[in-house]
Amino acid sequence: MKVILLEDIANLGKKNDIVDVSDGYAKNFLIRQKKAVALTSKSQEVLNKDLAILQAQEQQAILDATLLKDELEQKPLHFFLKTNNLQTFGSISNKQIIDEINKDQKLVIKHMITKPHALGIGEHIVEISLHKKVIAKVNVIVSKE
């Protein structure tokens, strides 16, 4: 029996996949637990509409992330650290970089910095994952206060 999965199921498939399973497994477990629906022409149409909506949302998310990437890469972020001769006190963390970006942006970016974890004095390139397919390389300048 062919069914459309309504959620991810280990060793079977992911949400919206069409899989072929035994009749008993489909009727007694998957359909009864509302983890799948039987494949019919109507359920196929609903699946196609849902997939089209998901694809449009994904394309819009990529477009938004690309626009944000272009904006972030144009202007560097400036930070200042206290120093005593050659010794610096502290470093710039991921949270400080995210907070600085969120001041200027309408979007809220959380935990997207891929590297590095702490920055000292100097000029650094920080990669920020805005989407699975879009990574912005932001110039971060850390100066003495």
From Swiss-Prot:
Family label: Belongs to the bacterial ribosomal protein bL9 family.
GO annotation (BP), single: translation
Gene Ontology MF terms: rRNA binding; structural constituent of ribosome
Pfam families reported for this sequence: Ribosomal_L9_C, Ribosomal_L9_N
Top-rank taxon, per record: Bacteria
Protein's name in the database: Large ribosomal subunit protein bL9
PANTHER family: 50S RIBOSOMAL PROTEIN L9 (PTHR21368)
Entry annotated with the keyword Membrane: no
Gene3D superfamilies assigned to the protein according to its UniProt record, in alphabetical order: Ribosomal protein L9, C-terminal domain (3.10.430.100), Ribosomal protein L9, N-terminal domain (3.40.5.10)
Alphabetized UniProt keyword annotations: Ribonucleoprotein, Ribosomal protein, RNA-binding, rRNA-binding
GO CC annotation: ribonucleoprotein complex; ribosome
HAMAP family listed in its UniProt record: Ribosomal_bL9
PROSITE patterns per the UniProt record, alphabetical: RIBOSOMAL_L9
Family matches, as InterPro entries: Ribosomal_bL9 (IPR000244), Ribosomal_bL9/RNase_H1_N (IPR009027), Ribosomal_bL9_bac/chp (IPR020594), Ribosomal_bL9_C (IPR020069), Ribosomal_bL9_C_sf (IPR036791), Ribosomal_bL9_N (IPR020070), Ribosomal_bL9_N_sf (IPR036935)
Its biological purpose: Binds to the 23S rRNA.
